[in-house]
């Protein structure tokens, strides 16, 4: 093995240093947990790069790309340290008559999204041919109906429903029907991911539900604490089973299934760190000018499905390279720095807010984002996604404008 392959170890060592530099780790438990999660993922990536875990990755370690990668990830992670303080804050009540109508509208949107996604899930295809689903998506990605667009718009409100569930558990704990319905609605993103045999939505949801428990536990009653723990156990168990089934089917169909299932799992967890240097070295200026992830801002789109069919490269392009790698591949190094700074600014803004329902919504969105950063950036800023964010911001302003001085609306 060449000496430079040991450069991969810079990843976990760097995250370990950040972890120990974080004082009062008991106070910043979730932030410390995020750092450890990144350290674990990068350690697996290091083992892939060193050949200890034998999988097919674009192994091309270079010092400058690795240092760039680490700095960008840490810049994105640091704002989450300020979020931990909200666990020790009381969720502020909303004194607006618009709360109930907003809740019912979110429930309706999420149920419409789930219904549309269930209709599009081809169980037989998932059980026999995962790859063909992706090919079909590429062929039909522009030929979608209004219902499909509306379902895509609705799925972004799953975590809004989860934040609302937290609010009702605190201020209306006896409204069990609404709370349970909101928890069901929070699964909208999971159903959206199952359309194409996606695994990341399942794992992401379990992570977000854990975050939800972390912040809600100090303020909700014993009944909902126990219920939430039970729900987390059920969701986690289902996620592991579905994740394993989809992984087996995908690799067995493509002829790449190794006899060791654990190897495939490790590959999923750490390949982004093993792949980044090659992406950085071969595509420093990007290939799509932002069209892969930010089409609404750059005015054109570029398909992220079956990239090797549209880009001539010896690298395997449909592999993880973490979110930073996805942005470098899409828009180039300098644009990636700019995007990272924008995200950090927005995340710091949320950390300076008062702890209310909308702060919780924005936090859940950003926690979903930072978890996705381990793999790739699949949160494409389409018009539907942008409008869904803008709509929540407008609703927040309307609630502030229509607030009343009476007790919170319950």
Predicted regions and their residues:
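Membrane-interface helix-loop-helix junctions at transmembrane boundaries of multi-pass membrane enzymes
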Residues: 24-30, 167-180, 350-361
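Membrane-embedded catalytic interface detector for glycan/lipid assembly enzymes
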Residues: 2-5, 80-206, 210-219, 241-253, ...
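Hydrophobic alpha-helical transmembrane segments
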Residues: 3-20, 41-52, 97-103, 175-185, ...
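Hydrophobic, aromatic-rich transmembrane alpha-helices
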Residues: 14-23, 158-173, 338-352, 405
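N-terminal "leader" segments that precede or initiate the main folded domain
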Residues: 1-90, 178-189, 205-209, 213-245, ...
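Small-residue-enriched transmembrane helix-hairpin modules in multi-pass membrane proteins
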Residues: 130-150, 232-348
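Membrane-interface micro-motifs in multi-pass membrane enzymes
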Residues: 2-8, 61, 146-159, 197-201, ...
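Hydrophobic alpha-helical segments
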Residues: 317-410
């Amino acid at each position: 093995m060449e000496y430079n392959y040991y450069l991969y170890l810079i990843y976990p060592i760097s995250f370990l240093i950040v972890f120990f530099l974080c004082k009062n780790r008991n106070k910043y438990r979730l932030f410390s947990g995020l750092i450890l999660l990144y350290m674990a993922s990068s350690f697996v990536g290091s083992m892939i790069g060193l050949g200890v875990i034998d999988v097919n990755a674009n192994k091309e370690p270079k010092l400058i790309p690795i240092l760039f990668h680490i700095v960008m990830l840490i810049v994105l992670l640091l704002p989450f340290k300020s979020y931990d303080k909200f666990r020790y804050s009381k969720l502020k009540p909303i004194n607006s008559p618009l709360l109930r109508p907003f809740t019912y509208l979110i429930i309706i949107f999420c149920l419409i999204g789930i219904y549309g996604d269930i209709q599009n899930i081809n169980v037989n295809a998932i059980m026999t041919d995962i790859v063909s689903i992706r090919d079909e998506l590429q062929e039909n990605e522009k030929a979608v109906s209004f219902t499909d667009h509306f379902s895509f718009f609705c799925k972004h409100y799953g975590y809004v429903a989860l934040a609302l569930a937290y609010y009702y558990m605190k201020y209306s704990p006896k409204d069990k029907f609404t709370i349970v319905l909101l928890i069901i609605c929070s699964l909208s993103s999971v159903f959206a991911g199952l359309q194409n045999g996606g695994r990341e939505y399942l794992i992401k949801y379990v992570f977000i539900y854990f975050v939800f428990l972390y912040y809600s536990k100090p303020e909700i009653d014993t009944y909902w604490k126990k219920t939430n723990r039970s729900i987390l156990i059920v969701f986690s168990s289902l996620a592991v089973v579905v994740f394993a089934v989809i992984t087996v089917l995908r690799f067995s169909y493509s002829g790449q299934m190794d006899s060791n299932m654990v190897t495939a799992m490790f590959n999923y967890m750490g390949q982004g760190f093993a792949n980044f240097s090659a992406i950085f070295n071969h595509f420093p200026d990007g290939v799509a000018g932002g069209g892969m992830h930010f089409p609404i801002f750059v005015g054109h789109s570029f398909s992220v499905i079956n990239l090797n069919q549209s880009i001539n490269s010896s690298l395997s392009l449909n592999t993880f390279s973490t979110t930073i790698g996805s942005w470098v591949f899409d828009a180039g190094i300098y644009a990636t720095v700019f995007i990272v700074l924008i995200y950090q600014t927005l995340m710091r803004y949320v950390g300076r807010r008062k702890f209310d329902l909308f702060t919780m919504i924005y936090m859940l969105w950003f926690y979903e984002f930072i978890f996705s950063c381990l793999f790739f950036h699949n949160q494409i800023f389409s018009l539907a996604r942008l409008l869904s964010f803008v709509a929540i911001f407008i609703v927040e302003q309307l609630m502030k404008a229509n607030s009343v001085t009476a007790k919170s609306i319950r």
